[in-house]
Amino acid sequence: MNTDELLRQYDNGERDFILANLSDACLTERCLAAINLSQSHLANANLSGSNLQRANLSAAVLTRAMLWRSNLASASLMSTNLNEANLIRATLTGINGNGASLRKADLRLADLRGANLSQVNLVGADLRYADLTGVNLTGANLSRANFTGANLAGADLRGVMLTHTIFENTDLSDISLVEVDLSQVDLRSAILS
């Protein structure tokens, strides 16, 4: 399926595009709210500025995808591969990203308030100045992730892996750190109360 066919079918009311192959597709600034692209291949796709609210991207492959300024509020990203994806300034409020992989993803200035990111892989991810207020990160791997200037107030960090994680100037107030080893974490100027 090519992008023209997908857009035509979407405009005609179709929402299910399970297992679609849209690698390298250009779908910038499009309204694709409530689309079902679960298990689809979207590696290197450009979805910058698109409206993907309530989209189902579960188990989809979005490796190196461009999602800059995209709106993914309340989307399902369970077990989605977003390794090395560009999510700068993306809206990810209320997403279900349980088990997703975001290795080396760029999430600078992203809005992740209230997201479920339990069991997520954020190894080497860049989350500088992101808003993660009230995020569920239980059991997540945050090794080598950079949270400089981010807001994690009220986040649940029970059982996370934090090897060489950077929390410089990060708001960590009212968070749960049960079963967390902080011995190899940079907490310079972090807000802990």
Regions found by a protein language model. Give the residues of each.
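Tandem repeat scaffolds
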Residues: 2-193
